[in-house]
UniProtKB/Swiss-Prot annotation:
It is a single-pass type I membrane protein. Homodimer and homotetramer. Residues 222-248 are annotated as: Disordered. It comes from Rattus norvegicus (Rat). It comes from the Eukaryota. The modification Phosphoserine is found at S210, S226, S228, S233, S237, S243. The chain crosses the membrane at residues 154-179. The lineage of its organism: Eukaryota, Metazoa, Chordata, Craniata, Vertebrata. The keyword Thylakoid does not apply. InterPro entries: Ig-like_dom, Ig-like_dom_sf, Ig-like_fold, Ig_sub, Ig_V-set, Myelin_P0-rel, Myelin_P0_CS, Myelin_P0_Ig-like. This is Myelin protein P0. Residues 30-143 form the Ig-like V-type domain. Keywords: Cell membrane, Disulfide bond, Glycoprotein, Immunoglobulin domain, Membrane, Phosphoprotein, Signal, Transmembrane, Transmembrane helix.
Length: 248
């Protein structure tokens, strides 16, 4: 390379941008969600929920596909398809007259309802969603169990027991704090009453002391007055006696 010729190596900034576009920003795959298990009674209906997350806006070409694999079977068959805004029920299988579309693509919902359940409906249902250009992702499966009478699941019973215990504990705590509040309030009222009584006694004793203080000079004055009156009376009597002696 001649001196002063421009370098042909890529710019470090361009290389970093290329690396980030290829490695740090991979295409996000669509994610599909369903229940893990659902239960239904013979002759009733059950809703198979299906929703999804996509990095793209909901496309007009969005599609939902439901497949069914019987219990113990190996092959899955298509039983429902939604595309171009229209639901299509496959004519193959026993669900063709029992499936109802209840989904709403604008809310990313592809749910269906199966009516008139039978024991033969036990199996696995698979929901597949395509939201072009986001078409890469995994499907989601839900297993249907049909019983003559839907049993109470262990999780529901356990949750009810735990909820009951927590309710009792909260009730006991509430009762404890209520009793404690009433006791403290009563103690405060009693304390205020005692304080008022003490203040009343203090004021009464103060009034009595001041009253006695005011009465003491009066008593002394009355005593001095009686003494002086008595002395004057004695002096007068003595003078009268002396005058009588002089006359004699």
């Amino acid at each position: 390379m001649a001196p002063g010729a421009p370098s042909s190596s890529p710019s470090p900034i361009l290389a970093a941008l290329l690396f980030s576009s290829l490695v740090l920003s991979p295409t996000l795959a669509i994610v599909v969600y369903t229940d893990r298990e659902v239960y239904g009674a013979v002759g009733s209906q059950v809703t198979l929920h299906c929703s999804f997350w996509s990095s793209e806006w909901v496309s007009d070409d969005i599609s939902f596909t439901w497949r069914y694999q019987p219990e113990g079977g190996r092959d899955a068959i298509s039983i429902f398809h939604y595309a171009k805004g229209q639901p299509y029920i496959d004519e193959v299988g026993t669900f063709k007259e029992r499936i109802q579309w209840v989904g709403d693509p604008s809310w990313k919902d592809g749910s269906i309802v199966i009516h008139n359940l039978d024991y033969s409906d036990n199996g696995t249902f698979t929901c597949d969603v395509k939201n072009p250009p986001d078409i890469v992702g995994k499907t989601s499966q839900v297993t249907l169990y049909v019983f003559e009478k839907v049993p109470t699941r262990y999780g529901v019973v356990l949750g009810a027991v735990i909820g009951g215990i927590l309710g009792v504990v909260l009730l006991l705590l509430l009762l404890f704090y209520l009793i404690r509040y009433c006791w403290l309030r009563r103690q405060a009222a009693l304390q205020r009453r005692l304080s008022a009584m003490e203040k009343g006694k203090f004021h009464k004793s103060s009034k009595d002391s001041s009253k006695r203080g005011r009465q003491t000079p009066v008593l002394y004055a009355m005593l001095d007055h009686s003494r002086s009156t008595k002395a004057a009376s004695e002096k007068k009597s003595k003078g009268l006696g002396e005058s009588r002696k002089d006359k004699k």
